[in-house]
Amino acid sequence: MANIALREYHRKIERLIENHQIEEAFSHCANILRKFPKEIETYRKLGKNFLEKQDIELSERIFNIILSVFPDDFVANVGLSFIHENKGEMDQAIEHMLMAFELQPANPSLQDELKRLYHKRDSVEPNKIRLTRGALIKMYARSNLFDQAIAEIKLGLYEKPNRIDFKLILADMLWKAGSRIEAVETCVDIVSQLPYCWKANEILDLAFQDLHREQAESNYRLRLAELDPYYRFMLPATQSVADIPDIAVQIESDLDEENGINDWANFLADTWVVSSL
């Protein structure tokens, strides 16, 4: 029996996908999910693998699962844009590509892709892709310009109240700015809609630890550990889960065909309850 660090296992699966070894990649993803059913990095591999296989229905479901954890995930939004375009749903295709653009507004490939999508929908290609409010919000957030970010987010939520990613950045900015009660209230609202949203659970766990240092783990931390088993090893002094050594989480990499996942649709339905974002 060969054990491998979970992060190294992810890198191995990524290489299989890059080499178009789709079925073997599926088997290794199933091996991880049998032990860690909500391990979110494996779902990133699965989404790309199902898209490579041209299984649109399952790849769409998986990308929506990822967005329920990371509402502005770059790869999931690009993947969903591609899927909606292929289904002829151009408004949704543009919406998801804009979400990706907001993370990388200076990326010329994304700008060109948006121009192409607008031309396909409207028969007119814009000369320039304008900076969106979402892109501005995320630029302010990355620079820790709390007041500017919060002001823009409140305007953004007035215009688009369903933008969960805006609410999430608002909670993060409020927490960092010291408005912790308002940050916690915002996160409670988010997890009522997206129970496994990473950042919201992370902030709520920090708030719980501040109040109950001697008590057992919070439900929020347990959820985070379901999504990333390395989170079980987080200590108060640990800055980020990425600082946990790779070898902390090991998994057997020998495949057992009898324990594979034959019906991915049922597995996803049993493991997650997620609506399209």
Regions found by a protein language model. Give the residues of each.
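Alpha-helical segment of the N-proximal tetratricopeptide repeat
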Residues: 4-41, 45-58, 131-158
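Helix-start (N-cap) detector for alpha-helical repeat units in TPR-like alpha-solenoids
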Residues: 5-6, 40-41, 74-78, 108-109, ...
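Register position in tetratricopeptide repeats
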Residues: 18, 52-53, 86, 103, ...
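Structural marker of alpha-solenoid helical repeat scaffolds
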Residues: 35, 69-70, 86, 103, ...
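Intrinsically disordered, low-complexity acidic segments enriched in Asp/Glu and Pro
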Residues: 108, 143, 211-214, 227-277
